[in-house]
Amino acid sequence: MATIEEIAHQIIEQQMGEIVTEQQTGQKIQIVTALDHNTQGKQFILTNHDGSTPSKVILARQDSTPGKVFLTTPDAAGVNQLFFTTPDLSAQHLQLLTDNSSPDQGPNKVFDLCVVCGDKASGRHYGAVTCEGCKGFFKRSIRKNLVYSCRGSKDCIINKHHRNRCQYCRLQRCIAFGMKQDSVQCERKPIEVSREKSSNCAASTEKIYIRKDLRSPLTATPTFVTDSESTRSTGLLDSGMFVNIHPSGVKTESTVLMTSDKAESCQGDLSTLASVVTSLANLGKTKDLSQNSNEMSMIESLSNDDTSLCEFQEMHTNGDVSRAFDTLAKALNPGESTACQSSVAGMEGSVHLITGDSSINYTEKEGPLLSDSHVAFRLTMPSPMPEYLNVHYIGESASRLLFLSMHWALSIPSFQALGQENSISLVKAYWNELFTLGLAQCWQVMNVATILATFVNCLHNSLQQDKMSTERRKLLMEHIFKLQEFCNSMVKLCIDGYEYAYLKAIVLFSPDHPGLENMEQIEKFQEKAYVEFQDYITKTYPDDTYRLSRLLLRLPALRLMNATITEELFFKGLIGNIRIDSVIPHILKMEPGQYSKTSSL
C-alpha cells in the first residue's frame, strides 16, 4: 500500500503541469505544486489551466483502511468537495472530510460516491456503487434496449451536473465501472394486460432522439444511434423511432377538418369504424376457434410477440388476417366509438352495398358523383400524444389514415354500386395511391415531414450496423424521397378538400387494373368525376387557367410509389408481415347494419 507521501509524489511528478478535469463541475484545472510538507496531510494548490489565481487547496490524508485516502478542502465543510483520481485513488473509495477532522477522530461526513457521476451513492446497484439517478438511467436503457450516440468524441464529462448531456457516454461509463446488463430484469407487467405486446425487453421500444422544431418541418437535427448488440431485424423500423413532437411554444393540433362543419355530421368518425372492425375480427377469431382452438391460440400468441413475426407471416390462415385486422383496429382506440353514433346512423340510410349480381347503371341516376358530405376528411390522431414519436405512434396514425380512406370510399354510392368484388379489387389496386394522397392532405396534422426524417435516420443507422444492403437502402431512400417530393408539391399547390376528394375519386375509379369487371362502368364513373372536378375548378378558380392540368399531372407520380415499401415503413411495426391486401376485404365486406350494432359498444 502506497503511503500518502508516495501518492503525493506521484501526483506532483506525474501530473505536474498537466491539465486535469474536476469531476464535480467539469472545470479544467492544473496542479502547480505542493506546500508545507510538515502538515499532517499533504496540501496541494490547484489553479485554472490558464494561469489564473489559485482557487482551491486540497488536503490528502491516508486512512487506516487500506485503499482509502481522504480528500478535503480546508475552507469548506465537506459538502462541495473537489476530488480527482490517480491510479491509486478509485472514485468508489473516496470519502470526504471537513478541515477540522483528523485521521484519529474520523470524518464528520462519510459516504460513498457514485462511480459514474460522483453524486452521493445510495448503494450497490447492478454490481456497482451508484446514485439513484444512474441506477434508473441504466435500468431504463437496458430494459428498453435503448441506444444512444455521442455528438462529441465519446469522452464527454460525466458528473453530477453534466451527466444528462450525453447519454451515450453515461451508459458507456456505467458499463465500464462494472454495472452488469444481465442483472437488469425484464419489466413485470400486470396480468390483465398480458395479451398485449410481448414482455421482451427489446421489443420495438428502442429510441432515436431527434431534436425537432415543427415550425421548420424539413430541418431535423437527428442524433444518430448505433446498436451493435441488436441482432433481431424485422424491418426498417425494428429499432424504433422517437422524435420529440412537443417543442415548447409550438401549438400542436390533433385533428384536422378539411371542410365546413356542416359536412362533419355526414362523415362517421374513425373510432366508430374501429369498433366495427374490432367486432368483425373477434367474430372471425371465434369462428376459427370453433374449428381449431389450439391453432388460434398459437396465432394469438405469435401475433403478440415481435420475435415471431416471421412465423406469423408464414401461417397464411384466415385467423392470421383476422388477428392483423384486430391489431389495426385496436390502434384506432375503439373505446371512443360512442362519439359518432349519429354520424353512422346518418350514413346508413344513404349507403347500400350492392352484390356482384346486381346490375344498376348508376350513371343514369341524377345527382353528382360526390356531394359535400364526401369532401369531409377528418383525421383524429392517437391520444394522448407521446412526448417522443415512436414506431407504434407512426403505425397507429397510418392505420387511422388507412381506415379513414376506406371509410371515405365506402361512403360513395357509385363505389358501392360496383358490387363487392369490384370494390375490393379497386381498393386492393389503389389503396397505396389513396393513402399517399391522404398523407399529403394530412401533412401538418400527421407531422409527415418529421416521420419521413425519422425514416431517413433509421436508414443511416441500419447501414452503419450492416443490417441492410446498400441496394436495399437505396431502394427505401428513393421511396422516401418520392413521398417527400410528392407531398411537398401538393402542399405548395394549396389544394382544398374538394380538390383532394375529386383527385381520390379519379384514382379510385381507374379502369386500367387487370381483372376488373364492369370496366366500362368504372370508366364512366371516372369520367364523371373528371367533369365535376373541371366544373369545380372553373367556378372556384376562374383566373387560374392551368390549375386543373397542374393537379392532374401530379397523379402519375402516385404510380411510382411501391405499395410493399409503404407497408414496411408505416405498418410493419404494428401488424408485422401481414399484407394490407389481406386486410382490405375485411373492411369492405362490412354490412351497413354492423355500423349501428357496434356503435354502441
Swiss-Prot record:
Q: Which locations, inside or outside the cell, does it occupy?
A: Nucleus; Nucleus, PML body
Post-translational modification here is noted as: Sumoylation requires both PIAS1 and UBE2I. Sumoylation appears to dissociate NR2C1 from the PML nuclear bodies. Enhances the interaction with NRIP1 but inhibits interaction with KAT2B. In proliferating cells, stimulation by all-trans retinoic acid, activation of MAPK1-mediated phosphorylation and recruitment to PML bodies with subsequent sumoylation, suppresses OCT4 expression.
Q: Which residues carry this modification: Phosphoserine?
A: 198, 216, 582
Positions carrying Phosphothreonine are 221, 223
Q: Residue ranges of the DNA-binding region? A: 111-186
Q: Which GO terms describe its molecular function?
A: DNA-binding transcription factor activity; sequence-specific DNA binding; zinc ion binding
Region annotated Required for interaction with KAT2B sits at 1-179
Crosslink feature (Glycyl lysine isopeptide (Lys-Gly) (interchain with G-Cter in SUMO)) location: 251
Q: Where would I find the NR LBD domain in this sequence?
A: 349-591
Domain of life according to the entry = Eukaryota
| UniProt-annotated stretches for the region Required for interaction with NRIP1 | 585-601
Q: Name one GO cellular component term.
A: PML body
Q: Which UniProt keywords apply?
A: Activator, DNA-binding, Isopeptide bond, Metal-binding, Nucleus, Phosphoprotein, Receptor, Repressor, Transcription, Transcription regulation, Ubl conjugation, Zinc, Zinc-finger
Which sites are covalently linked via Glycyl lysine isopeptide (Lys-Gly) (interchain with G-Cter in SUMO2)? 251, 589
Q: Kindly list the ranges of residues that form NR C4-type zinc fingers according to the record.
A: 114-134, 150-169
UniProt xrefs under PANTHER family: NUCLEAR HORMONE RECEPTOR
This protein's assembly is summarised as: Homodimer. Heterodimer; with NR2C2 which is required for chromatin remodeling and for binding to promoter regions such as globin DR1 repeats. Interacts with ESR1; the interaction prevents homodimerization of ESR1 and suppresses its transcriptional activity and cell growth. Interacts with NRIP1 (via its LXXLL motifs); the interaction provides corepressor activity. Interacts with HDAC3 (via the DNA-binding domain); the interaction recruits phosphorylated NR2C1 to PML bodies for sumoylation. Interacts with HDAC4 (via the DNA-binding domain).
Q: What role is this protein assigned?
A: Orphan nuclear receptor. Binds the IR7 element in the promoter of its own gene in an autoregulatory negative feedback mechanism. Primarily repressor of a broad range of genes including ESR1 and RARB. Together with NR2C2, forms the core of the DRED (direct repeat erythroid-definitive) complex that represses embryonic and fetal globin transcription. Binds to hormone response elements (HREs) consisting of two 5'-AGGTCA-3' half site direct repeat consensus sequences. Also activator of OCT4 gene expression.
Q: What family does this chain come from, according to its entry?
A: Belongs to the nuclear hormone receptor family. NR2 subfamily.
Protein name as catalogued: Nuclear receptor subfamily 2 group C member 1
Q: Output the lineage of the source organism.
A: Eukaryota, Metazoa, Chordata, Craniata, Vertebrata
The gene that this protein is the product of is NR2C1
